[in-house]
């Protein structure tokens, strides 16, 4: 890291102590060319200081950041925050991101959010050629199906077609 990056890191940590989610939103909206460590650090901190107002910034990171690691952390943080407003971006990443770790984490995040509307898209992701992505989508599908059954009191749902 450059010397000025350490100062930026201190500023991020100060904003974290103040629980200033808006600082992180502003930072992420202008961070594309900053070092990976700073971008990932900011995304991870939002899990602890963010509320629904940070979702759109995290969704932009998930879609546009050049690093799969940063996009993965954005998906993780969106899942931990748990807002349904992130579902569309997570579905898009799960089905279309070039990186398997991003697709995997997006499926896991959808499970964490618990929105049954993601079930059809998870069923598509079960067919992913990457085994980890496919398994993550299947686990998420099973969990959301379980939630649906419990909410409706139903006993059975159609199982997705699983490639063996």
Feature roles, as predicted:
Residues 2-5, 36-37, 52, 68-69, ...:
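Alpha-helix N-cap/helix-start positions at coil->helix boundaries
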Residues 15-31, 51-64, 83-95, 115-127, ...:
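Amphipathic alpha-helical scaffolding segments comprising HEAT/armadillo-like alpha-solenoid repeats
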Residues 130-141, 153-154:
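Solenoidal tandem-repeat scaffolds enriched in leucines and small polar residues
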Residues 6-19, 26-27, 32-49:
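Alpha-helical segment of the N-proximal tetratricopeptide repeat
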Residues 8-11, 42, 74, 106, ...:
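Conserved hydrophobic register position within alpha-solenoid helical repeats
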Residues 65-84:
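Helix-adjacent hinge/juxtasegments
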Residues 14-15, 45, 77, 109, ...:
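Core register positions within helices of long alpha-helical scaffolds
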Residues 46, 61-62, 74-78, 93-94, ...:
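TPR/Sel1-like alpha-solenoid repeat signature
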């Amino acid at each position: 890291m450059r010397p000025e990056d350490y100062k930026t890191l201190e500023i991020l940590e100060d904003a974290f102590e103040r629980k200033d989610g808006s600082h992180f939103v502003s930072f992420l909206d202008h961070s594309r060319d900053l070092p990976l460590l700073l971008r990932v650090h900011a995304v991870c901190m939002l899990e602890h200081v963010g509320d629904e107002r940070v979702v759109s910034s995290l969704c932009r990171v998930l879609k546009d950041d050049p690093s799969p690691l940063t996009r993965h952390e954005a998906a993780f943080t969106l899942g931990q925050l748990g807002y349904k407003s992130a579902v569309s971006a997570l579905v898009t990443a799960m089905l279309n991101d070039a990186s398997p770790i991003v697709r995997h984490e997006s499926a896991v995040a959808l499970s964490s959010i618990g929105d049954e509307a993601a079930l059809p898209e998870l069923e598509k992701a079960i067919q992913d050629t990457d085994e980890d992505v496919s398994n993550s989508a299947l686990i998420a599908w099973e969990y959301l199906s379980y939630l649906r059954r419990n909410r409706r009191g139903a006993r059975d749902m159609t199982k997705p077609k699983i490639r063996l």
